Each structure stands twice: as C-alpha cells, then as structure tokens.
C-alpha cells in the first residue's frame, strides 16, 4: 500500500511493521518535499511519524478521538486522514491549514495553535462520553514543552482524581519545545530519558541468553516475564510523579520503534483509568539537518532540500523587527543591569536569543508559561528591576488577568514588547496578532505605543525602559522598512505625543504603527486626485495626543484612522471616543480589520482581501467622502 492510497487511518489496521515502516518513509518524504516548497513546521512532524502510525493502528478512528496539542506536529496525521493529494496547498490561501481545524477534516477533533490545551480537551470529551453512556477512547498527544504549561498540569491534576475515566495521554518527549526546554519538570523528564540503561540491560541479557548453545531459546522465552517485571519496577520508580498524580505510567518507549510502540499502546488501551505513555522521540527525525539543528528547523521558510539552506531572496532585505529589538535591548542592557529580558519559550522568535548569548544573567526563559512570565516580571519590578516581557501578541492573551491584576492595578514598571502584532500570515487565526490594542487599551494605567519603523522601535525601547509604569509596544512580523539604524544614542519619546508627517487641508489621516507608511502612500494617491491630507503618526494609542489631534479634527472636519488590528475597541475606536468626549461631531472612517477571523494566507494576500492596500484604502476614502472617481479605475 502507498501513502497516496490512504484516505482513512483505519486502513493501517492489519499492516505489518515492514509495511508501516514503508508508509513512514513516504510520510517523511512528502512532509519534507511540501515544507521545502511552502514553508511550515518541519521538525515536530518528522519526530512523530512512528508514534502516529503505531497509535492509529491500535485505534478505531471511526469512533476513537485523538487531540493533538498545538497541532504543528500533526502533519503525519493530516497525510493519513485523506489530505495527501492536496497537501501541496499547506499553509497556502484556501489550502490546508498549518494547524488542526474542526472545519477542515472530520478527524480533526479539536482545533489548536496555542500550547497545553490537549489534555483538558480530551478529558472533556471523555467526560462527555461517559455522561452520554458511550464507549470510545479519548487520547491527548502532548509534547514535553507543552507539558510545562500550567493548563496541562491542571488537567493532569483533574484527570488523576477520576480513576474510572478512561483517558490516554501520550507524552511526546523530544526534550524540546521550539527551543530547548527549561524547568524542573523538563529536568525530571530528562532523567527518565537517560534511564534507558534499564532497557539496554534487559535487551542485552536477552541477546546474551539467545547465544547459549542448545538451550538459549528456551531460557530467553522464560526470561521474558522477568524482563518485563524488571522494566515495570524501573517504570514505577522513574514515573513516580505521574503515578502519584493518579496516572498509570508506561515508558519511556522508543518513539521510533514501531513494534515497541504498538505493543505499549495496546497494553495502555486495556486500562480503565487515566494512563500516560511516555514516548522518547527525536525532533526532525530522518532529515539530518533538522536533527542537528532542532531549533533552526522547528519551522522553516521555503528551503533547498539538498542543502537544508533557505532559498535566497531576490535582493537583500533589511533586518527583521525581532532582530532590531534583540540587538537594541542587548545594547541597552549592557549599560543598565536592571534590565532583564523574559520569554515564554520563544527566545529565537522574539530576538531574545541575542540577549541570552551576550548577557545570560539578564535573560530568563520560563517555558510555555505566559501567566507565570507576567507575574514573575511584576515581582522583579517590585524590587527595582526593569523587566522586559518579549512575547507574541497572540500569546499575551493567555495572561490577560495577570496583566490587569498583577501589573496594572499595582502600576508596576513592566514593559511588554509584543512581536507578531497584526497580520502574521500562514499560521492563521490562532496566531494573528489582532486584539492587543483593544484588550490592552481598556486597562487603567497601561500605556500603548507602536513604532512606524525599526528606527522608531529603538527609541520606543528606550522610552519603555525609562517609563515608571506598565507600558506595551507592538511591532509586526517580518523585515523592517530599511531606514538607517543608529547603533547607540537613542533618545526616548515623550509619552502620548504624536508626530505630524504631512500637511493637508482636506483630510486628517491618523495612523498607528505599521500602518503609517501605507497611510502616507494612500495620501500620495489621494493627492493625485486633488485631495490633500494631513498625516499623523500617532505613536501612542493610549494616551492619545489630544492636544494635536482634536484641533486638527475640528479644523479639517474629516478623519480617517489606520490600524493593523481589530476595529472593535481598537485605535479607531479610541479616536472616536476622544472626539466624542470633546463634543466633535465629525465623520470618521476607521480602517483596519473588521470583526472576523483572518484565515491563513500570505500577509499580502490577507491585506488584499481585507482592503488594506494603499489603493484600496484610497478608494474607500473617496467613496466615504463623496468622490465618484475610484483610484483603481483611474489607474486601470
């Protein structure tokens, strides 16, 4: 059987180990070819090929349900559930999503994108099953990185108190999340992994007995119960934490040995209560470049399979916002020992790996624990430090209560630096940074700012570190504009003060962050049609520069706002609230992301679909304020 013939995972039933190994080879081949062409997560999926095949051979997927944590390791799952022939559309607009979506396939039982949710979801399904008198298996597959998240531990704590609830947790332990794992739990799991001498001892004894002339086979057969007893004794000791929490612990199992995996899963299915099977895997298995550099090959842009190197850009690009952030913060930290960078398992993605290498004592990785990261920062701020929490916009959502309760109510000087703010592209709705302006703007004592380019990002970093209270800066994914970057001597910005970039009499355009340059381009297009616009770089969404904005709005009488975020509660809402508070009844056109989920596509495709290109925005402005001539029509 070829992988291309598999449309249902139950087709794996009855296949030999040799046949499964052949399909595993085909999965890796398709996985590598596709990600090399489209980009996507590479290492996670390569590491769970055998785990997926063995698990699915022992389940009835017409009835049983598997929940994959995060979902970026579920590419083999997608290939085994009828998506082989359109797998080339992975992460492309209108194609297969990079994560799991309930609307995409009937075997995607729970959508995700953020970590540590799988055990809670699978336990919920198990309890629903029992409440309705049904009988099927519920399985959560979770990585050791995700297991550091508090929600996963909360779910384990709950499940362990339900001895009659049948639940299987498969711990995919590759000693990595995106970067190497941190913390006591990770250290404990690593001790379990290195306890493999027990496995080696029993296997060695078996091989030795087989070589005894005449009686070796019989002795070996008789030794099997002893061998299993030795293993169980070892397991009960090394898995003590999980046993004490109410789980039957099995493992560690070689995650690339199909025979051992199948036997272990079949044994696990016999238990009636919660079971944890500990599977030791290698991230990036089967592709040497990914095995050697597990951080770099966690996820990749399109690359050359033969060399493992990214396909060269057509022309040199400016440094990314993340890199500018990391380099600038490191320079500032060298002269200010109060500065400490905090990440929740995203050092490389946020640029904090630069600080980690240069000043390791001023760097903290808390693991996948956003709530802890925020309160840790609050505690450090209480005692004179200047913590900088570097985090993706989408992940700060997970610590919303802590931002309010532990930082803002106490007005502590914690600096939130929100990478990937706005449209992020192929990762889709779970990763879009759409909501931070709205959900942070409503919190008293919080200051919000966003740079128009990478040079202003440097100045805002100085501003945030100097400010004596809660403050947040958002900046987008990807490369900067390409403006000159001074290496030192950055000046802070006055809090709540905007910048006028262009003078005009017909229209007031107020832009925030990454939308400043598109607003300037829009103004140029409007100017060609006889409309002159004043363009303001707001810099701050809270507090607004009302001393500048309100008189201009009163004078010009027509206002357009620009933001790369959700319109409900966002920057445009802040402007309209301000004008209303000053009794100004002027027409306002807010431009941004409407009340919808932005699906996976390239950032440019998403902006086109949302009407956020300069030409589209100019057309909307002309339509709003009475002109019948459209920019697009005029340029056609």
Swiss-Prot record:
Protein encoded by which gene: dxs
Cofactor, how bound (note): Binds 1 Mg(2+) ion per subunit.
SMART domains: Transket_pyr
EC number per UniProt: 2.2.1.7
Biological role stated in the UniProt entry: Catalyzes the acyloin condensation reaction between C atoms 2 and 3 of pyruvate and glyceraldehyde 3-phosphate to yield 1-deoxy-D-xylulose-5-phosphate (DXP).
GO molecular function: 1-deoxy-D-xylulose-5-phosphate synthase activity; magnesium ion binding; thiamine pyrophosphate binding
A Pfam family annotated for this UniProt entry: Transket_pyr
Protein name per UniProt: 1-deoxy-D-xylulose-5-phosphate synthase
GO cellular component: cytosol
Species this protein is from: Synechococcus sp. (strain ATCC 27144 / PCC 6301 / SAUG 1402/1)
Catalytic activity: D-glyceraldehyde 3-phosphate + pyruvate + H(+) = 1-deoxy-D-xylulose 5-phosphate + CO2
Residues reported in the UniProt entry to bind thiamine diphosphate: 72, 113-115, 145-146, 174, 287, 370
Positions of Mg(2+) binding: 144, 174
GO biological processes: 1-deoxy-D-xylulose 5-phosphate biosynthetic process; isopentenyl diphosphate biosynthetic process, methylerythritol 4-phosphate pathway; terpenoid biosynthetic process; thiamine biosynthetic process
Cofactor(s) the protein needs: Mg(2+); thiamine diphosphate
Pathway as given in its UniProt record: Metabolic intermediate biosynthesis; 1-deoxy-D-xylulose 5-phosphate biosynthesis; 1-deoxy-D-xylulose 5-phosphate from D-glyceraldehyde 3-phosphate and pyruvate: step 1/1
UniProt similarity note: Belongs to the transketolase family. DXPS subfamily.
UniProt keyword terms in alphabetical order: Isoprene biosynthesis, Magnesium, Metal-binding, Thiamine biosynthesis, Thiamine pyrophosphate, Transferase
Top-level taxon in the UniProt lineage: Bacteria
NCBIfam families: dxs, PRK05444.2-2
Subunit-structure text: Homodimer.
């Amino acid at each position: 059987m070829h992988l291309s013939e598999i449309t249902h995972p139950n087709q794996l039933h009855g296949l030999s180990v040799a046949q499964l190994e052949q399909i595993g080879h085909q999965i890796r081949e398709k996985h590598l070819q596709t990600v090399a062409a489209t980009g996507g997560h590479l290492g996670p999926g390569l590491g769970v090929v055998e785990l997926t095949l063995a698990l699915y051979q022992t389940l009835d997927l017409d009835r049983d349900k598997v929940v994959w944590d995060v979902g970026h390791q579920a590419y083999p799952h997608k290939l085994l559930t009828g998506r082989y022939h359109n797998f080339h559309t992975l992460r492309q607009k209108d194609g297969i999503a990079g994560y799991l979506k309930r609307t995409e396939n009937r075997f995607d039982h729970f959508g995700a994108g953020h970590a540590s949710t799988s055990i809670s979801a699978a336990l919920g399904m198990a309890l629903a099953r029992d409440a309705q008198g049904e009988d099927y298996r519920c399985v959560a597959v979770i990585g050791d990185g995700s297991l550091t998240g508090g929600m996963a531990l909360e779910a384990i704590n709950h499940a362990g108190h339900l001895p009659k609830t049948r639940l299987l947790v498969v711990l995919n332990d590759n000693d990595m999340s995106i970067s190497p794992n941190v913390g006591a739990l990770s250290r404990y799991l690593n001790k379990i992994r290195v306890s493999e001498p027990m496995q080696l001892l029993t296997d060695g004894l078996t091989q030795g007995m087989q070589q005894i002339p005449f009686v070796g086979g019989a002795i070996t057969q008789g030794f099997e119960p002893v061998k299993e007893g030795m293993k169980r004794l070892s397991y009960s000791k090394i898995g003590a934490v999980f046993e004490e929490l109410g789980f039957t612990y099995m493992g560690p199992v070689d995650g690339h040995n199909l025979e051992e995996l199948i036997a272990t899963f079949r044994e696990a299915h016999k238990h009636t209560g919660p079971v944890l099977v500990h599977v030791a895997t290698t991230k990036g298995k089967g592709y040497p470049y990914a095995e050697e550099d597990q951080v770099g090959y966690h996820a990749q842009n399109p690359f050359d399979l033969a060399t493992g190197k990214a396909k060269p850009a057509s022309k040199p690009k400016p440094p990314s916002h993340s890199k500018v952030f990391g380099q600038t913060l490191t320079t500032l930290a060298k002269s200010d020992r109060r500065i400490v960078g905090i990440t929740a398992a995203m050092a490389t993605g946020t640029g904090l790996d630069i600080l980690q290498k240069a000043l390791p004592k001023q760097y903290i990785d808390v693991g996948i624990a956003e709530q802890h990261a925020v309160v840790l920062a609050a505690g450090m701020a209480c005692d004179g430090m200047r913590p900088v929490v570097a985090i993706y916009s989408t992940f700060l959502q997970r610590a919303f209560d802590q931002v309010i309760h532990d930082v803002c109510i106490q007005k502590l000087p914690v600096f939130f630096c929100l990478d990937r703010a706005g449209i992020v592209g192929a990762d889709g709705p779970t990763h879009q940074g759409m909501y931070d302006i709205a959900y942070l703007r409503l919190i008293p004592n919080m200051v919000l700012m966003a740079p128009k380019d990478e040079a202003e990002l440097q100045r805002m970093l100085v501003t945030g570190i100097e400010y004596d209270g809660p403050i947040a800066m958002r900046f987008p994914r990807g490369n900067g504009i390409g403006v000159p970057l001074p290496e030192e001597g950055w000046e802070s910005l006055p809090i709540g003060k905007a910048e006028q970039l262009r003078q005009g009499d017909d229209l007031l355009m107020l832009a925030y962050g990454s939308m400043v340059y598109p607003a300037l381009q829009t103004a140029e297009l409007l100017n060609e049609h006889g409309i002159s616009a004043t363009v303001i770089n707001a810099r701050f969404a809270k507090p607004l520069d009302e001393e500048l904005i309100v008189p201009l709005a009163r004078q010009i009488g027509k206002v357009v706002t620009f933001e790369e975020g959700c319109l409900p509660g966002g920057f445009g809402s802040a402007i309209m609230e301000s004008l209303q508070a000053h009794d100004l009844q002027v027409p306002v056109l807010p431009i941004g992301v409407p009340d919808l989920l932005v699906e996976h596509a390239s950032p440019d495709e998403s902006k086109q679909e949302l009407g956020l290109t300069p030409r589209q925005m100019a057309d909307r402005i002309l339509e709003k304020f009475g002109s019948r001539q459209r920019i697009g029509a005029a340029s056609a």
